[in-house]
Amino acid sequence: MITIKKGLDLPIAGTPSQVINDGKSITKVALLGEEYVGMRPTMHARVGDEVKKGQVLFADKKNPGVVFTSPASGKVIEVNRGAKRVLQSVVIEVAGNEQITFNSYEANQLVSLDRETVKTQLVESGAWTALRTRPFSKVPAVDSETQAIFVTAMDTNPLAAEPELIINEQSDAFVAGLDLLSTLTNGKVYVCKKGTSLPRSAQSNVEEHVFDGPHPAGLAGTHMHYLYPVNAQNVAWSINYQDVIAFGKLFLTGEIYSERVVSLAGPVVNNPRLVRTQIGASLEELTDSELMPGEVRVISGSVLTGTEATGPHAFLGRYHQQVSVLREGRDKELFGWAMPGKNKFSVTRSFLGHLFKGQLFNMTTTTNGSDRSMVPIGNYERVMPLDMEPTLLLRDLCAGDIDSAQALGALELDEEDVALCTFVCPGKYEYGQLLRECLDTIEKEG
């Protein structure tokens, strides 16, 4: 067991009940183009086209062979683009059950499949896009290889679902997915989990590792740091547990499995719980009649790293397993910094709230102050469990010192790995955005 001591479990109200419920019927789904780092689309569908589930909607010019397929059958009703014609989303009005089918196999046949057979079916079905590389967090090239694949079978994000509940419901598909991943690498498949029992693969290169501690103990970046540190030469892949289930379902049934169990939670959700929906589901429909009155912000993903679900982005992200909802923090409090703060949370124990152990807080979107200079008071070290110098690294990101940031370990990180640093930063810096700019520059300049 690897025990993480540094970190932070955010004490936010609205924890979901760990029981899976059926979500609302969804009439619109979408693929969000901006989720895929560095992707430049070649469109294969246009507004008005009827598409089947599994049909190619667009491909990546910069990553030949990688295609992105429809999560449902229906009609393309929107292709939304932003500044410089960046693809924001392709929206489909769900209708019918037509789908493209693929080869199916018995569970005992999967381990005998060769790598090219597995890879070809994953690529053609669009399931390949569930994998992400580290460094850079991109969809791996079709002809690339890795010595390590990390399965994130735990989730320490605030308000997250308990993975073992979902995995044990689909145990056969999960094991099948692990067997398939074992064929994609000559190295190891690391299944990172809490201390609970999960279905196991019998393959010799599939290993289980137990992590314990506060967030970010459940992040792929943390697991890689301790088990297989990445750099420009050592590239690892990661995948979440629900996509492992989807891999298994694809090969066992020959059909694309687009179902997703997500936590619908937060301080302004009437009944926080786990709901069964699908990848790309409209969050306007999913949250209809579920929220308390007032101005709220719906977030696809964690409150720490998710994206605001509004306009062309109002859909469940490809890599997201939760929908979080916060109240918009528009109200200003006179001399709020001088008040006792019984109902306020502070990492530095600036308010009385820290005296009440176990108290959950109705957090909002307010930043509690305006932008200011970066002040190193030890906050970053409290929440960063990785063996690196967070204050120096974050300072270099702010200054745009790419060489120094790379030397301090920037290639190991993704936006989610510095999310807690953003949360505890008294200067209100968005370190995830600064890190992404740094990684883009490193990749561009080689």
Curated annotation (Swiss-Prot):
Family: Belongs to the NqrA family.
Pfam families with a match to the protein in the record: NQRA_2nd, NQRA_N, NQRA_SLBB
Keyword set includes Translocase: yes
Record's subunit section: Composed of six subunits; NqrA, NqrB, NqrC, NqrD, NqrE and NqrF.
Top class in the EC scheme: translocase
EC number: 7.2.1.1
Described purpose of this protein according to its UniProt entry: NQR complex catalyzes the reduction of ubiquinone-1 to ubiquinol by two successive reactions, coupled with the transport of Na(+) ions from the cytoplasm to the periplasm. NqrA to NqrE are probably involved in the second step, the conversion of ubisemiquinone to ubiquinol.
Top-level division of the source organism's lineage: Bacteria
Annotated GO biological process: sodium ion transport
GO MF annotation list: oxidoreductase activity, acting on NAD(P)H, quinone or similar compound as acceptor
Keyword annotations from UniProtKB, A to Z: Ion transport, NAD, Sodium, Sodium transport, Translocase, Transport, Ubiquinone
InterPro entries, sorted: NqrA, NQRA_2nd, NqrA_C_domain, NQRA_N
Catalysis performed (reactions): a ubiquinone + n Na(+)(in) + NADH + H(+) = a ubiquinol + n Na(+)(out) + NAD(+)
The protein's name: Na(+)-translocating NADH-quinone reductase subunit A
Disulfide bond sites: none
